[in-house]
C-alpha cells in the first residue's frame, strides 16, 4: 500500500487526538511522584511545604493535633495548623482527585 494513501488518516488522528500538553498537566500524583512533580515542574528552587507523616501519625490521627486557642505561643501553633491543612489539600487534590501542575499555590 502506498504511503501517501495513509497520510489523510494520519492527519485525522493528529487533529482529533488529545493535546499532549493538556494530558500531561492534569494527573493523579501520589507519594514520591507528587513530591518530584512539585519540586521539578512547579516550585523549583522556591520549594514547597511537605512533611511526610510517620506510620504512627497515619494510624493515630490524634498525634500531632494542634489546638487553635489563644494563649502563649498560639501564633506558632496556628501557623503549624495552617501548614498541616495546606499539606492535606495538596494530598487531597493530587492523590484523590486530579491536580494541575500549573497551580503554584503549593509553593513556599
Swiss-Prot record:
Q: Which residues form the propeptide?
A: 57-88
The family note in this entry says: Belongs to the insulin family.
Higher taxonomy: Eukaryota, Metazoa, Chordata, Craniata, Vertebrata
Organism whose genome encodes this protein: Rodentia sp
Q: Which cysteines are joined by disulfide bonds?
A: 30-94, 43-107
Name any one Pfam family assigned in the record.
Insulin
Summarizing the function annotation, the protein's role is: Insulin decreases blood glucose concentration. It increases cell permeability to monosaccharides, amino acids and fatty acids. It accelerates glycolysis, the pentose phosphate cycle, and glycogen synthesis in liver.
Annotated signal sequence range: 1-23
Keywords on record: Carbohydrate metabolism, Cleavage on pair of basic residues, Disulfide bond, Glucose metabolism, Hormone, Secreted, Signal
Q: Which Gene Ontology CC terms are recorded?
A: extracellular space
Give the protein's recorded name.
Answer: Insulin
Where in or outside the cell it occurs: the entry states:
Secreted
Indicate yes or no for the key word Metal-binding.
Answer: no
> Could you tell me one molecular function GO term of this UniProt entry?
insulin receptor binding
Quaternary structure (record): Heterodimer of a B chain and an A chain linked by two disulfide bonds.
The biological processes this protein is annotated with in GO are:
cellular response to oxygen-containing compound; glucose homeostasis; glucose metabolic process; positive regulation of protein secretion
| Chief location bin | secreted
Amino acid at each position: 500500500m502506498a504511503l501517501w494513501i495513509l497520510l489523510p488518516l494520519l492527519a485525522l488522528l493528529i487533529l482529533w487526538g488529545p493535546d499532549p500538553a493538556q494530558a500531561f498537566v492534569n494527573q493523579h500524583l501520589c507519594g514520591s511522584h507528587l513530591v518530584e512533580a512539585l519540586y521539578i515542574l512547579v516550585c523549583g528552587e522556591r520549594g514547597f511545604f511537605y512533611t511526610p507523616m510517620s506510620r504512627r501519625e497515619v494510624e493515630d490521627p490524634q498525634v500531632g493535633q494542634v489546638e487553635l486557642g489563644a494563649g502563649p505561643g498560639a501564633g506558632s501553633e496556628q501557623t503549624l495548623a495552617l501548614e498541616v491543612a495546606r499539606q492535606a489539600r495538596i494530598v487531597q487534590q493530587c492523590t484523590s482527585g486530579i491536580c494541575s501542575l500549573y497551580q503554584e499555590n503549593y509553593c513556599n
